Amino acid sequence: MAPTIPPPSVPIPAATPVTVPADSSIWDRVSNWVSEHKAVVYTIAGVSVVITTAGVVYYLRKGSEQKESGPKLSKKERRKRKQAEKGEAEKASTSKTEEAAPTQPKAAAVESADELPEIDEESVVRLSEDERKAYAAKLKELGNKAYGSKDFNKAIDLYSKAIICKPDPVYYSNRAACHNALAQWEQVVADTTAALKLDPHYVKALNRRANAYDQLSRYSDALLDFTASCIIDGFRNEQSAQAVERLLKKFAENKAKEILETKPPKLPSSTFVGNYLQSFRSKPRPEGLEDSVELSEETGLGQLQLGLKHLESKTGTGYEEGSAAFKKALDLGELGPHEALAYNLRGTFHCLMGKHEEALADLSKSIELDPAMTQSYIKRASMNLELGHPDKAEEDFNKAIEQNAEDPDIYYHRAQLHFIKGEFAEAAKDYQKSIDLDSDFIFSHIQLGVTQYKMGSIASSMATFRRCMKNFDQTPDVYNYYGELLLDQNKFQEAIEKFDTAIALEKETKPMCMNVLPLINKALALFQWKQDYAEAEQLCEKALIIDPECDIAVATMAQLLLQQGKVVEALKFFERAAELARTEGELVNALSYAEATRTQIQVQENYPELASKLQGMSGGPGMR
């Protein structure tokens, strides 16, 4: 997948398109296997095995082997068997137990429940084994008729008597169906659980219990049952597979809302913050806030000066301290002509922490105090876009142009608006306009190359990046994003060479605040090219040592572990990804992965014999 926008705008949960962060192309490649192997993620039979078509093939082949075994039948017998099999195929998914329902002895043939003796716990002990079986079968038959007539309470009574005669998983499941029709969900759970104790692989009972759990909002339990059903049934029931996907989404969305209600605001990783801040051209400090000017830290101006100094360190600690300083500066006040800048900066960090209302208020206040500060319009435009208000975003860009039509940042960020909307030709025009106004800003060149690539102009894109490498040969971002384009074309060797160059330049030019994205890109390249899990893991570990808060490094590590069948270890990283999620959308994704992985572990614990069989079918690169 082609790389997207290098310097990120701040993501905000919304139903509309959101600005894609610098590392979104990495995320695309990390999670690309999900769309290609949906059964692996959503039915969680195990990433350590091939669970897409291989799972189905296994079950279908096993069924055909069973049919072909035994003595050869006559033509008449084969025709009779074929008719019987056709009848069975028309029924809903059933367990082998139900298919092998007891035969009714002729001596017990009756037409109604009135012809049967009174059945209760005391009377049943006086019946012989054969009588109990025969009466149970007849009671089940009568229960089926009552169910078909929608006389569910009568059917429940008949199935209950059948169970007294002979505890059978089919009878429990059928009684559960009656409770299901009456929306008596707890009773459905009780009866299907009893059925599954007798036959753990009873697919119909699993599906019924899963549906009841769903109705009771016990989504994790429902997910586990539907997942087990999919695996046992060989992924032949599309409704169950869809239910798994739906439940994962429902569970994650509900859980995300709960978490966000109590989750304290927090800055994202230093990599993310740094990429966002560098999407604006650097400018010298305003007059009166230079280091040469002595200001007391007990004053608002002193705190504003201190905050700017912290930002220049380009470290996680620096960003945290800078954010605190901007807040304190406004609390202390007396900022004079720099008050608009203070609101701009505090609003920026509110935005990065996901405090969107506060951010919009601060940016609007900054504009009110200094309408000529175009950066405040740009930041508010980005937020409006991500909050689903593209008209307001366009209005802010137009207002910024009215203030200063020669500000190249306006066109760079407006190009991102076009890029997100898929208006690549318009995006390319604005990136070029940004370059024409200031050709020294590397990201305008990089993003122009990316846009050309998205438009299908591969030759133009490659030429743009070659010019970048010539004119910005000491800028690691050029090699990193060019490497992404090469990786997208499966030019693995060349891509890795570019990532290595980017890594070396990061170490050389920014030893204290290295961008870890080239490390992660190289890890993914080695994984895709050689399935070199060991080296890929080591690179991710290095990235996490440098930037422990880097969500993309965490997500990549989780996927690498999952691909190797290291499910328990992968779960820890998926849970960590949820902790690092900045927006509701990111949190829902992380929770979905975590819950899918957690369910896989439970399935393997509950059905060890099934997991063993499936692992025997493992195949494909890197799967063990």
UniProtKB/Swiss-Prot annotation:
Any one GO biological process: protein import into mitochondrial matrix
Signal peptide boundaries: none
Subcellular location: Mitochondrion outer membrane
Basic residues composition-biased segments: 73-83
Function: Receptor that accelerates the import of all mitochondrial precursor proteins. Seems to act in conjunction with mom19.
Membership in a protein family: Belongs to the Tom70 family.
Name used for this protein in its record: Mitochondrial import receptor subunit tom70
